[in-house]
Swiss-Prot record:
HAMAP family: UPF0297 (MF_01507). This is UPF0297 protein Sez_1866. Belongs to the UPF0297 family. InterPro entries: IreB.
Length: 89
């Protein structure tokens, strides 16, 4: 796969943003209830793509797999920047 020197645009629908946020919250709580470190497990999943980082408990694994990992990363970056006073257009 070749790479280009051109900047590529990536866009995520506003409705998906809200659903990803709700899904991450639900997955976080499921991981916490099972005694895992939710942050470590979510990071493991996002970096590797291995769904084994997220348990089937409360259907958490199926919920998080509804979204591409790049969509999850985009929502996490957006949330972080907005929380630090950056005006996201």
């Amino acid at each position: 796969m070749g790479f280009t020197d051109e900047t590529v645009r990536f866009n995520l629908d506003d409705g998906d943003k809200k659903q990803i946020s709700e899904t991450l919250t639900a997955v976080y709580h499921s991981l916490d209830e099972k005694g895992y470190n939710p942050i470590n497990q979510i990071v493991g999943y996002v970096l590797s793509g291995d769904p084994a980082y997220v348990p089937r408990y409360n259907d958490a694994r199926n919920q998080i797999r509804k979204y591409e990992r790049d969509e999850i990363v985009e929502e996490l970056v957006r949330y972080y920047l907005q929380g630090n006073g950056i005006d996201i257009r």
